[in-house]
Amino acid sequence: MDFDAIVIGGGHAGIEAALALSRLNFKTLMITQNLDTIGKLSCNPAIGGLAKGNMVREIDALGGEMGRIIDFSMIQFRVLNKSRGPAVQAPRAQADKLMYQTKAKETLERQDNLDLFQDTVVDFLLNSMRNEIEGVVTERGNKFRSSVVVLTTGTFLRGKIFIGEYRADMGRLAEFSAYGLDKTLLGLGFEMGRLKTGTPARIHKKSVDFSKTEVQFGDSDIIPFSFSNGKLDKSQLSCYVTYTNKKTHEIISENMHLSPLYSGEIVGNGPRYCPSIEDKIVKFKDKDRHQIFIEPEGFNTEEMYLNGLSSSLPENIQQKLINSIEGLEHAVITRPGYAVEYDYINPIELYPNLESKRVKGLFIAGQTNGSSGYEEAAAQGLMAGINAALRLQNKKPMILTRTSSYIGVLIDDLVTKGTKEPYRMFTSRAEHRLNLRHDTSDKRLIKIGYDLGLVDEKRYSRYLFKESRVEEIKELLKQRRLSLKDVVDEQLKKHVSKDFYHILKDPSISLDNLIKIDPSLSDSKVILEQVELDVKYEGYINRQKDLIKRLDNLELVKLPFDFNYEIIEGLSREAREKFSKIQPATLAQASRIPGIRSTDITVLLIYFSNPKNKVVINFSL
């Protein structure tokens, strides 16, 4: 059977890729090993967090689905870093795992132009003359033809799980690995490696003594992840906090030789910023305790997730170390923790549009690219789906810049630097994070989603109304002046005769203070928060915008794909090798490649400034 596009895998990357392609009116097929595990939250039952929550809102602004699914399935909501500045605040929600999964599958099943099929892809159909994808072959011998393929295998490509001495060819506990494509990819010359991740044990709620733990409530005011949702009124479940102790650490240290992480069994690098409890004990010997979050997995399950206690130690040792923790003395394990090792492709094998440099029409997204996390996977899946659709239309790729989004930072880091360990997004990876606040995701990206056709007219009109109202309130603030009779407290006295706009810049004055004086300024919480942040941080934002404008000038220098950098005189040997391998899309990307000198960038600029070299440069530094 023929399709326009095929998506391999039903995880978070696959979901976004399949929906983007089908919503852009391309006949799409998703092939996954088990239709009942589409959208499964394999590890922690949560979406969002620092930088990750921003990405979920960016996905939503572009027309993706993750924000709507978590809004539907959340069981607790919190804004992280509330006491700190807006640049590092982020929404995070606990999810009902089964509800999330069910909603994801239902969304796919009801989508026009999209078929789902349960099978395992083992090979590609290729036009070897043009080095171009033409479809896939499955384990059962089915052949499906298409012009583009999006590969999102997650942890399943030659996946292997470890629990003490137990080994099994699985991508998740009780779910078989995928074989076949690994040989195809190696045969095509892809640079591949092994990575490792892990998950903690789950325990039964009735076996926890919550009186010995600290309760963590959700926020009463829920900020929807999706801009299409208004106020959310949800029942929320609490999370709980406890800590490891000296006894816990002794148990782990005494049995470290039984951990496949330290016995040499696992060769793949694990996530630096989400280490196993074994790693924590080895690398942070000075710490006498580590925080553990006991998180519910849903409304209709008694299983609890032990966030911070990922382990691949033998099951009896996991039981001992868990029972050594306060509140968990009688905890009953329902599922053991384990490590999983899997194949990945070095992402420098990809262009910035996530298309493979080796095979035309093959796009790759998610953990297959060396990233870690549901949100990182979904972001790449959406961008791969969008760019696969643009390729089908013979249109230019859509590449988000580092200054426009966390998604842009994510993909640029991956395809420019590659990775040797699971890549996780942080606010610190973005040079201009004040410009990438989660509340401005629609302002930055919704026009792109609208122009693509992934954001409908109704939703875009609602955004335009919101923005016009924000600007209207700012104008009212500039026009309204504080009179002596308005002063109700000492803080305002020094601002008499000033306009409200400049008064609001005072850190000690909130917009609520001014609304009490003039109720006509009142509006929805979302609009008022954006107004206040825009005004208070206007100076910082404008300075960042000036810097971004200068940096974006380098993005305007587009470099040709498949270019022979050996012909450019004056480049260092290292620059020639790295430019030839990575094939940067812009001068800005070239400048971010590790090891590249400023002189190499100058040489490129001079070379491509020559009109005969067919690169149009339109900027002024």
Swiss-Prot record:
UniProt-annotated binding residues for FAD: 9-14
Residues holding NAD(+): 270-284
Primary location class: cytoplasm
GO cellular component, one term: cytosol
Swiss-Prot/TrEMBL keywords: Cytoplasm, FAD, Flavoprotein, NAD, tRNA processing
Molecular function via GO: flavin adenine dinucleotide binding
Cofactor section: FAD
Presence of keyword Flavoprotein: yes
Pfam family, one: SAM_GIDA_C
Alphabetical GO biological process terms: tRNA methylation; tRNA wobble uridine modification
Cellular location(s): Cytoplasm
Domain of life assignment: Bacteria
InterPro entries from the UniProt entry: FAD/NAD-bd_sf, GIDA_C_N, MnmG, MnmG-rel, MnmG-rel_CS, MnmG_C, MnmG_C_subdom, MnmG_C_subdom_sf
SUPFAM superfamilies the UniProt entry points to: FAD/NAD(P)-binding domain (SSF51905)
Family that this chain belongs to: Belongs to the MnmG family.
Oligomeric and partner information: Homodimer. Heterotetramer of two MnmE and two MnmG subunits.
Function, as annotated: NAD-binding protein involved in the addition of a carboxymethylaminomethyl (cmnm) group at the wobble position (U34) of certain tRNAs, forming tRNA-cmnm(5)s(2)U34.
Protein name: tRNA uridine 5-carboxymethylaminomethyl modification enzyme MnmG
